[in-house]
């Protein structure tokens, strides 16, 4: 599947399975962390929490935990699938119970963006970016800015795209590794920007100049990769079947339609690459929209104490976790990881053909389910009587 050396293939395949098992294990740990520990709302390291967000009274130990509710409020929220937590369900802080430093622990600061982020960026690149910055000190440097890192990884992506277009499988694999380095640098520039703004955890600063610069650089990097994919497939058109070997020595007439046939192959390559590009655009647009919507709905602080408890209730619901997990595997970063894996395994054309139509169906289903959840959650938090009748 991966190359002529069976030993290397077995090692790489084993590493892939171990990585998948690690992702599943971390997802289970993330689910348990969300349900068993308080959700920290203070995302700024130098800002104290408002009283309405910390909890209903200072005598209670759980900061940022789910609020209590009386039996009457449970009955008024009968439109939801489960009842609200009671006052006795105050939850401890995760920071006080984990043995891994929250500086590198991806489960420590749980935010909307962290839950919607793909597994590789959340569990691997984000902690690695933190450790790399702790050693090199980019966030403490006044010379290097996050935007400089963003522009630099565009150059890395261009080099990766050039290698991906190569006829050599070894160079294409090197291009895959370079593009993953670009993804790591993308995590690094976000980490440096958040550290300088004293923001803990993953969070999108929507509307800032850095947000748009980072988006522009990410788009340019994806374009470089897609161009490399197109030129590789154009120069190495996939075979449609086995060549027919003549049984006699008689010379066959030369084919007269070679040029039109090559044009048809190029058009087919272009259609598949354009189809995948459309999926990346659709996934990126929807994913960034839902990060903005959920951040505004679940992490805003200009709400009443009752609404704050309902925000925590929605955040901890299994329905929201399922919606978020769905986007972890269909967002633009996950799609890029899949196409990079197909390039590394020399299965690029098979992947593009398999996802040409099914990818759109999966994305549309994910969008419809997410829109339904958003409408239900917004109505529950801001419009229903369940939140207004919670007994604090």
From Swiss-Prot:
<feature type="topological domain" description="Lumenal">
    <location>
        <begin position="1"/>
        <end position="10"/>
    </location>
</feature>
<keyword id="KW-0746">Sphingolipid metabolism</keyword>
<feature type="transmembrane region" description="Helical">
    <location>
        <begin position="11"/>
        <end position="31"/>
    </location>
</feature>
<keyword id="KW-0472">Membrane</keyword>
<comment type="function">
    <text>Catalyzes the biosynthesis of ceramide phosphoethanolamine (CPE) through the transfer of a phosphatidyl head group from cytidine 5'-diphosphate (CDP)-ethanolamine on to the primary hydroxyl of ceramide.</text>
</comment>
<dbReference type="GO" id="GO:0005886">
    <property type="term" value="C:plasma membrane"/>
</dbReference>
<keyword id="KW-1133">Transmembrane helix</keyword>
<feature type="compositionally biased region" description="Low complexity">
    <location>
        <begin position="59"/>
        <end position="82"/>
    </location>
</feature>
<keyword id="KW-0812">Transmembrane</keyword>
<feature type="topological domain" description="Cytoplasmic">
    <location>
        <begin position="341"/>
        <end position="356"/>
    </location>
</feature>
<feature type="transmembrane region" description="Helical">
    <location>
        <begin position="357"/>
        <end position="377"/>
    </location>
</feature>
<protein>
    <recommendedName>
        <fullName>Ceramide phosphoethanolamine synthase</fullName>
        <ecNumber>2.7.8.48</ecNumber>
    </recommendedName>
</protein>
<dbReference type="GO" id="GO:0000139">
    <property type="term" value="C:Golgi membrane"/>
</dbReference>
<feature type="transmembrane region" description="Helical">
    <location>
        <begin position="213"/>
        <end position="233"/>
    </location>
</feature>
<keyword id="KW-0333">Golgi apparatus</keyword>
<keyword id="KW-0443">Lipid metabolism</keyword>
<feature type="transmembrane region" description="Helical">
    <location>
        <begin position="320"/>
        <end position="340"/>
    </location>
</feature>
<dbReference type="GO" id="GO:1905373">
    <property type="term" value="P:ceramide phosphoethanolamine biosynthetic process"/>
</dbReference>
<keyword id="KW-0808">Transferase</keyword>
<feature type="topological domain" description="Lumenal">
    <location>
        <begin position="378"/>
        <end position="392"/>
    </location>
</feature>
<dbReference type="InterPro" id="IPR043130">
    <property type="entry name" value="CDP-OH_PTrfase_TM_dom"/>
</dbReference>
<feature type="topological domain" description="Cytoplasmic">
    <location>
        <begin position="32"/>
        <end position="140"/>
    </location>
</feature>
<feature type="topological domain" description="Lumenal">
    <location>
        <begin position="162"/>
        <end position="212"/>
    </location>
</feature>
<feature type="transmembrane region" description="Helical">
    <location>
        <begin position="272"/>
        <end position="288"/>
    </location>
</feature>
<keyword id="KW-0444">Lipid biosynthesis</keyword>
<dbReference type="GO" id="GO:0005794">
    <property type="term" value="C:Golgi apparatus"/>
</dbReference>
<keyword id="KW-1003">Cell membrane</keyword>
<comment type="similarity">
    <text>Belongs to the CDP-alcohol phosphatidyltransferase class-I family.</text>
</comment>
<keyword id="KW-1208">Phospholipid metabolism</keyword>
<feature type="topological domain" description="Cytoplasmic">
    <location>
        <begin position="234"/>
        <end position="271"/>
    </location>
</feature>
<feature type="region of interest" description="Disordered">
    <location>
        <begin position="59"/>
        <end position="91"/>
    </location>
</feature>
<dbReference type="GO" id="GO:0002950">
    <property type="term" value="F:ceramide phosphoethanolamine synthase activity"/>
</dbReference>
<feature type="transmembrane region" description="Helical">
    <location>
        <begin position="141"/>
        <end position="161"/>
    </location>
</feature>
<feature type="topological domain" description="Lumenal">
    <location>
        <begin position="289"/>
        <end position="319"/>
    </location>
</feature>
């Amino acid at each position: 599947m991966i190359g002529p050396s069976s030993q290397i293939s077995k090692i790489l395949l084993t590493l892939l399975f171990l990585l998948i098992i690690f992702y599943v294990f971390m997802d289970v740990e993330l689910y348990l962390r969300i349900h068993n520990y308080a959700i920290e709302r203070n995302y700024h390291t130098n800002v104290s929490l408002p009283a309405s967000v910390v909890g209903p009274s200072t005598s209670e130990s759980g900061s940022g935990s789910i609020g209590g509710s009386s039996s009457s409020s449970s009955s008024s929220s009968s439109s939801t699938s489960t009842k609200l937590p009671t006052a006795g369900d105050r939850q401890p802080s995760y920071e006080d119970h984990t043995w891994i430093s929250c500086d590198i622990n991806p489960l420590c600061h749980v935010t909307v963006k962290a839950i919607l982020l793909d597994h590789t960026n959340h569990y691997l690149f984000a902690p690695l970016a933190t450790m790399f910055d702790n050693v090199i000190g980019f966030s403490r440097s006044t010379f290097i800015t996050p935007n400089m890192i963003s522009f630099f990884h565009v150059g890395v992506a261009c080099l990766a795209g050039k290698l991906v277009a190569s006829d050599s499988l070894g160079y294409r694999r090197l291009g895959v590794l370079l593009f993953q380095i670009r993804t790591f640098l993308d995590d690094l520039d976000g980490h440096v920007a958040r550290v300088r703004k004293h923001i803990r955890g993953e969070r999108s600063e929507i509307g800032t100049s850095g947000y748009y610069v980072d988006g522009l650089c990410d788009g340019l990097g994806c374009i470089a990769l897609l161009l490399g994919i197109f030129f590789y497939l154009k120069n190495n058109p996939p075979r449609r079947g086995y060549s027919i070997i003549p049984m006699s020595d008689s010379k066959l007439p030369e084919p007269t339609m070679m040029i039109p046939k090559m044009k048809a192959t190029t058009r087919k390559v272009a259609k598949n690459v354009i189809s995948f590009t459309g999926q990346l655009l659709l996934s990126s647009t929807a994913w960034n929209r839902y990060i903005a919507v959920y951040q505004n709905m679940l992490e805003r602080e200009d709400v009443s104490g009752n609404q704050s408890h309902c925000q925590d209730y929605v955040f901890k619901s299994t329905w929201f976790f399922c919606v978020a997990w769905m986007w972890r595997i269909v967002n633009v970063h996950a799609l890029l990881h899949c196409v990079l894996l197909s390039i590394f395994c020399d299965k690029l054309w098979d992947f593009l053909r398999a996802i040409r139509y099914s990818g759109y169906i999966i994305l549309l289903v994910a969008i419809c389910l997410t829109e339904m959840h958003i409408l239900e959650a917004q109505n529950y938090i801001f419009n229903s009587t369940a939140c207004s009748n919670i007994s604090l």
